[in-house]
């Protein structure tokens, strides 16, 4: 009998065990689509990014004009640029939904998978930040200045660290050059980490909405979930095309249509929408070092989530109190995002401070307490 190449070839076997014959829980919902959607996002961003990099010039005197040239003179350059800029927004929408899914259904109890995922989020945030600097518009320049300056809050080595990152005494040509190098490199780091993420996931298998072991009822990934994933791909790519073609500048800042000018500060310096929640937490603390620590903690707190799980149940499916708390947390994050987009004045300052306090309070204090309380309720 002829060997089945798909199951025996050293390379095809890996693909087969990951995407075709993978035993998958029979009851996973649409919330489990976002992992593969993130994979498609990454591929789209790498392809459009490579095409843009062929026409981009990483020099302060040429960067802005090279982006303008791309949009005016390169065949479909305007489309490639709009797909790349809005693809980043879709990437973050998918990753936030993916993390929310993991949080709700207790997927974080696969500790290795979860921790690699948090590292992936941090790498993605770094990639998006350095990428935003490349067009060398006003918001690019001042965003880079403000965020890199935060490192100067580190005691003793801060100022040296910032000047080392800048390659001089301000954000200038060396900064732009190294940011381009980093922006080119990091997506490939993300791709590598993604493989590690998947390797750890396939050690344990996927979680499911009930949060219970599903070994007794698994189905092959293909055709059941491959076809379901293709629906997700279609919906996402249609959304991306619609955004890029109908309102490409909806999520951008008009300030970035002005070339970078170190002598004129924009009236409101703010990051892209996907960083606003963290920016609001940064601004909510009047002390510079305190703000930087809170900013770091707002994302690094994800590493603690597996350690703060007190419930006997894995998923929140049958935990109504935790569900209420979860949706309060989501609402709180939306409030932080809105506050981050507003100027730093009354009443936004106090709203931001309350929302920041509540964010940490819910995750560090209320979730563990409610988990214990629900365990008690099980015994009634």
Curated annotation (Swiss-Prot):
<feature type="transmembrane region" description="Helical">
    <location>
        <begin position="289"/>
        <end position="309"/>
    </location>
</feature>
<keyword id="KW-0830">Ubiquinone</keyword>
<keyword id="KW-0479">Metal-binding</keyword>
<feature type="transmembrane region" description="Helical">
    <location>
        <begin position="34"/>
        <end position="54"/>
    </location>
</feature>
<dbReference type="GO" id="GO:0008121">
    <property type="term" value="F:ubiquinol-cytochrome-c reductase activity"/>
</dbReference>
<feature type="transmembrane region" description="Helical">
    <location>
        <begin position="348"/>
        <end position="368"/>
    </location>
</feature>
<dbReference type="InterPro" id="IPR048259">
    <property type="entry name" value="Cytochrome_b_N_euk/bac"/>
</dbReference>
<dbReference type="InterPro" id="IPR027387">
    <property type="entry name" value="Cytb/b6-like_sf"/>
</dbReference>
<keyword id="KW-0249">Electron transport</keyword>
<feature type="transmembrane region" description="Helical">
    <location>
        <begin position="227"/>
        <end position="247"/>
    </location>
</feature>
<keyword id="KW-1133">Transmembrane helix</keyword>
<keyword id="KW-0679">Respiratory chain</keyword>
<keyword id="KW-0999">Mitochondrion inner membrane</keyword>
<dbReference type="InterPro" id="IPR005798">
    <property type="entry name" value="Cyt_b/b6_C"/>
</dbReference>
<keyword id="KW-0472">Membrane</keyword>
<feature type="binding site" description="axial binding residue">
    <location>
        <position position="84"/>
    </location>
    <ligand>
        <name>heme b b562</name>
    </ligand>
</feature>
<feature type="binding site">
    <location>
        <position position="202"/>
    </location>
    <ligand>
        <name>a ubiquinone</name>
    </ligand>
</feature>
<keyword id="KW-0496">Mitochondrion</keyword>
<dbReference type="GO" id="GO:0046872">
    <property type="term" value="F:metal ion binding"/>
</dbReference>
<dbReference type="GO" id="GO:0005743">
    <property type="term" value="C:mitochondrial inner membrane"/>
</dbReference>
<keyword id="KW-0813">Transport</keyword>
<keyword id="KW-0812">Transmembrane</keyword>
<dbReference type="InterPro" id="IPR036150">
    <property type="entry name" value="Cyt_b/b6_C_sf"/>
</dbReference>
<dbReference type="InterPro" id="IPR005797">
    <property type="entry name" value="Cyt_b/b6_N"/>
</dbReference>
<dbReference type="Pfam" id="PF00033">
    <property type="entry name" value="Cytochrome_B"/>
</dbReference>
<feature type="transmembrane region" description="Helical">
    <location>
        <begin position="179"/>
        <end position="199"/>
    </location>
</feature>
<comment type="similarity">
    <text>Belongs to the cytochrome b family.</text>
</comment>
<dbReference type="GO" id="GO:0045275">
    <property type="term" value="C:respiratory chain complex III"/>
</dbReference>
<feature type="binding site" description="axial binding residue">
    <location>
        <position position="98"/>
    </location>
    <ligand>
        <name>heme b b566</name>
    </ligand>
</feature>
<feature type="transmembrane region" description="Helical">
    <location>
        <begin position="114"/>
        <end position="134"/>
    </location>
</feature>
<protein>
    <recommendedName>
        <fullName>Cytochrome b</fullName>
    </recommendedName>
</protein>
<dbReference type="InterPro" id="IPR016174">
    <property type="entry name" value="Di-haem_cyt_TM"/>
</dbReference>
<keyword id="KW-0408">Iron</keyword>
<keyword id="KW-0349">Heme</keyword>
<dbReference type="Pfam" id="PF00032">
    <property type="entry name" value="Cytochrom_B_C"/>
</dbReference>
<comment type="function">
    <text>Component of the ubiquinol-cytochrome c reductase complex (complex III or cytochrome b-c1 complex) that is part of the mitochondrial respiratory chain. The b-c1 complex mediates electron transfer from ubiquinol to cytochrome c. Contributes to the generation of a proton gradient across the mitochondrial membrane that is then used for ATP synthesis.</text>
</comment>
<feature type="transmembrane region" description="Helical">
    <location>
        <begin position="78"/>
        <end position="99"/>
    </location>
</feature>
<comment type="subunit">
    <text>The cytochrome bc1 complex contains 11 subunits: 3 respiratory subunits (MT-CYB, CYC1 and UQCRFS1), 2 core proteins (UQCRC1 and UQCRC2) and 6 low-molecular weight proteins (UQCRH/QCR6, UQCRB/QCR7, UQCRQ/QCR8, UQCR10/QCR9, UQCR11/QCR10 and a cleavage product of UQCRFS1). This cytochrome bc1 complex then forms a dimer.</text>
</comment>
<dbReference type="InterPro" id="IPR030689">
    <property type="entry name" value="Cytochrome_b"/>
</dbReference>
<dbReference type="GO" id="GO:0006122">
    <property type="term" value="P:mitochondrial electron transport, ubiquinol to cytochrome c"/>
</dbReference>
<feature type="binding site" description="axial binding residue">
    <location>
        <position position="183"/>
    </location>
    <ligand>
        <name>heme b b562</name>
    </ligand>
</feature>
<dbReference type="InterPro" id="IPR048260">
    <property type="entry name" value="Cytochrome_b_C_euk/bac"/>
</dbReference>
